[in-house]
Amino acid sequence: TLFKNLCECFKTRLFYLCMDEAHTMGLGRRLDKEGYVPKSELLAQHMERVGKLCEKYGISPIISSDMFFRPFAPGYYTDTGEVPQEVIDRVPSMYRIMYWDYYNCEKSEQSVAKFHHMIQQHKRFHNPIMFLGGAWKWMGFAPNNAFSLYSSDFHINGCLRHGIDDISLATFGDDGSEASRF
């Protein structure tokens, strides 16, 4: 299996499984074959299956949080929406929750309120919270270091004010993968 191979290749047992952008789950062939199943139910079933594999191999999984928010909001994240408590209660405690946000970083009242709201919503989970910001290199031929520093300042300071000190930075190779990371 994939997990067995990963464990043979790497010493770490902390793996970011991502599982983000899964807001259309259950709407493809599964819908045609088995009928409609609520996304929250499919997600809970999937996390249970993956969790058993993680336990088998001693893996501490990290998953993206947008999949909990997207079914209940018009976008990835919102300044008003909430994840239903019954969804939160079905997230196994072994999972670390990664709140990723590369865009919401304006130092306006609206952005600050949205970021604060999202942190408060993440704290409703009974899981460790991590934050993932972005080093902007995916939007053209040159990295946007100035914006990366600007957004990192906003996100890091916001996380620390809310007691979140497990912070990571991502770079992506899409939409301008020609750009250097530096």
Question: Which stretches of residues belong to each language-model region?
Answer:
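Substrate-binding groove of N-acetylhexosamine-processing glycoside hydrolases
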Residues: 1-8, 12-15, 21, 32-182
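Short acidic/His/Gly/Ser-rich catalytic and metal-binding motifs that mark active-site loops
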Residues: 24-29
